[in-house]
């Protein structure tokens, strides 16, 4: 199979996107329907489609709204987006308008080689497949369906054979934190370009008791940093902006004198580049990221389910740029507690979704972070 041709212009450089105007990434939950019953599902997915979902005509108009924002990267997700028969029309319309499109299907009977090929021909640039364990015992327990692990491997193999760039997603919880090294080996073996590591936020079916501790977050961040130095794939994190702080700290340790090289925040993490100073530009809920639900509600992210509007009533660009919720989330001066006092608040800012899920206030301290800002004298989190 030949590599996929370049259909659209290259993604913009991370620093060239004004997050006050355009998100770097927009995720769109086109349906909540899914055949799986994942224990940590953000969407609390259901077996049948919701009759309130955006119609095919509304869906195409939403694509036009997204294009008018400045062409962020579009992630088509669910539930299982393959449960929508018009998903290929949505992808084709988005790709034809110049958007880079990622698809996040569930590894079910719908993820046939034929359907994956249809997505590729419609214009998908990347495929995201979840793997939450290195073996059936761990993964299938997560997914709630026996045989899901084997099906996941089959889908990944089909994606690779079709020449579609593969991103593997893993949700970190107390059930699989010890399995991460083995999962990383699987990620390499399937030829993934990116490993996206999500740190559980208590929303949907995800429970606070399933989360790893703050110290386990920190230890995992340092392990991921070490892994990223040698892995054949890029490492990215979701709902873990404090990983950026760890990367900066570890980079400073490795380059104590600077040597004329500064850290640069990019979509894939931190890279090095001569003569370019860092900016306070870190993607977070509502800051460089936007989420549209299956019924058109506009959220800062799928894990911070506080609606700022609906695409049926307002253009998504208007809500993202001007709503009180989104503008507050992009203002680090409004952060509270340790996050508000932290010298890394611009590039990190803590997970606003986790702060909301654990404290009820999306501007409060992210309780999963152990770091004590220089200006704060209290001890680290437990």
Regions found by a protein language model. Give the residues of each.
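Residues at alpha-helix caps and immediate loop-helix transition turns in enzyme cores, especially N-
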Residues: 58, 86-87, 115, 179-183, ...
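Flexible loop residues that form catalytic
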Residues: 46, 79, 132, 200, ...
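Radical SAM enzyme [4Fe-4S]-AdoMet core and its adjacent flexible, acidic
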Residues: 1-7, 54, 100, 120-122, ...
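Conserved alpha-helical substructure of the radical SAM core
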Residues: 2-126
């Amino acid at each position: 199979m030949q590599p996929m041709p370049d259909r659209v212009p290259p993604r913009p450089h991370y620093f060239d996107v004004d997050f006050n105007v355009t998100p770097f990434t927009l995720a769109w939950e086109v349906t909540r329907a899914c055949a799986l019953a994942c224990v940590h599902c953000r969407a609390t997915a259901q077996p049948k489609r919701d009759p309130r979902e955006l119609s095919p005509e509304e869906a195409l108009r939403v694509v036009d709204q997204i294009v008018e924002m400045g062409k962020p990267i579009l992630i088509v997700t669910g539930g299982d987006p393959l449960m929508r028969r018009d998903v290929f029309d949505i992808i084709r319309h988005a790709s034809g308008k110049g958007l880079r499109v990622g698809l996040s299907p569930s590894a079910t009977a719908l993820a046939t080689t034929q359907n994956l090929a249809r997505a590729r021909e419609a214009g998908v640039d990347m495929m995201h497949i979840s793997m939450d364990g290195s073996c059936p015992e761990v993964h299938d327990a997560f997914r709630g369906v026996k045989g899901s692990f084997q099906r996941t491997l089959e889908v990944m193999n089909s994606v690779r054979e079709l020449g579609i760039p593969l991103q593997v997603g893993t949700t970190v919880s107390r059930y699989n934190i010890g399995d991460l090294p083995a999962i990383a080996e699987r990620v390499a073996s399937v030829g993934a370009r990116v490993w996206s590591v999500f740190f559980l936020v208590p929303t949907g079916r995800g429970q606070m008791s399933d989360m790893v501790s703050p110290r386990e977050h920190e230890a995992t961040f340092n392990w991921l940093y070490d892994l990223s130095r040698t892995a054949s794939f890029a490492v990215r994190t979701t709902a873990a902006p404090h990983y950026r702080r760890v990367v900066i700290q570890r980079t400073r340790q490795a380059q104590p004198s600077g040597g004329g090289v500064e850290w640069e925040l990019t979509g894939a993490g931190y890279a090095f580049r001569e003569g370019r100073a860092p900016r306070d530009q870190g993607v977070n809920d509502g800051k460089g990221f936007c989420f549209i639900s299956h019924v058109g509600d506009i959220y800062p992210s799928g894990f911070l389910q506080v609606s700022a509007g609906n695409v049926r009533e307002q253009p998504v660009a208007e809500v993202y740029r001007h709503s009180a919720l989104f503008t507050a989330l992009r203002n680090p001066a409004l952060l509270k507690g340790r996050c508000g006092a932290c010298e890394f608040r611009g590039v990190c800012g803590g997970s606003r979704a986790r702060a909301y899920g654990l404290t009820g206030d999306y501007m409060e301290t992210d309780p999963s972070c152990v770091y004590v800002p220089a200006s704060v004298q209290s001890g680290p989190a437990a």
